[in-house]
C-alpha cells in the first residue's frame, strides 16, 4: 500500500509507475519475475503490464456487460460472473436487466460504490501482472471493503498496489510505503 496526505506525491508516483511522467532525477526501473537481476527503465511499453483502477467512477455509457468487456472483449459469462463475485458486485445479477442494465456516462443509475465495484471487476478481467488501485475502496462501506480486499488479495502471482488514505486497507498488504509531503520531515 502507498499512503500519504493529499499533495504528498501519491498521484506523481502513479504517473511514474505508468510512465506517464518522467522523473526529474534518477530513474524508475522494473524487474521481471523470471529475471529479477535484470532491470529495465520504465517506458510506455511497460504500461501493458498494468491494470489501473483510478479514483472515482470510470464507467462508460452503455450496458454493464459492455463496460466489463472493455477489460477483456472475449470474456465468457463464467469469467464475467467470477469477476463480479470477486469484486463484490454480485448485485448486478439481481438487477432487472442483469448484465444488460444500462448505465449512463460516469455510471449514472448506480451508486458510486456499485460503479466502483464494476470498474474493479473490469480490471480483474483485464488480468495483468500488476494491479494498481487508486482509492478504489473509498466509496465502499467497511464490510464490503473488507470482503473485496480479502478477495483481491487471494489473487495469485500478481503485484497489487493500493493507493489509499484508509489504514484498514494497509492491514491486507505485505508492505506499506508512507509518502510524506513537504514539511513533514521526509
Indicate where each model-derived feature is located.
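Conserved ABC ATPase "signature" region
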Residues: 78-98
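ABC-family ATPase nucleotide-binding domain "signature/switch" substructure
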Residues: 12, 51, 56, 64-67, ...
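ATP-binding Walker
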Residues: 8
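Conserved post-Walker A segment of ABC ATPase nucleotide-binding domains
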Residues: 1, 5, 15-82, 147, ...
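Helix-loop segment at the mouth of the active site in Rossmann-fold oxidoreductases
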Residues: 41, 95, 101-103
Amino acid at each position: 500500500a502507498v499512503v500519504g496526505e493529499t499533495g504528498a506525491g501519491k498521484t506523481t508516483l502513479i504517473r511514474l509507475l505508468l510512465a506517464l511522467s518522467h522523473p526529474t532525477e534518477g530513474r524508475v526501473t522494473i524487474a521481471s519475475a523470471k529475471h529479477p537481476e535484470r532491470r529495465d527503465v520504465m517506458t510506455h511499453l511497460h504500461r501493458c503490464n498494468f491494470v489501473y483502477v483510478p479514483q472515482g467512477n470510470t464507467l462508460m455509457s452503455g450496458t454493464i456487460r459492455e463496460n466489463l468487456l472493455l477489460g477483456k472483449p472475449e470474456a465468457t459469462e463464467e469469467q464475467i460472473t467470477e469477476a463480479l463475485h470477486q469484486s463484490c458486485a454480485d448485485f448486478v445479477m439481481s438487477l432487472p436487466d442483469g448484465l444488460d442494465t444500462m448505465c449512463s456516462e460516469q455510471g449514472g443509475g448506480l451508486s458510486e460504490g456499485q460503479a466502483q465495484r464494476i470498474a474493479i471487476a473490469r480490471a480483474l478481467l483485464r488480468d495483468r501482472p500488476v494491479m494498481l488501485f487508486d482509492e478504489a475502496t473509498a466509496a465502499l462501506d467497511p464490510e464490503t471493503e473488507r470482503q473485496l480486499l480479502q478477495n483481491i488479495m487471494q489473487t495469485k502471482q500478481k503485484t497489487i498496489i493500493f493507493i489509499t488514505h484508509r489504514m484498514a486497507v494497509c492491514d491486507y498488504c505485505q508492505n506499506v510505503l508512507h509518502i510524506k509531503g513537504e514539511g513533514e520531515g521526509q
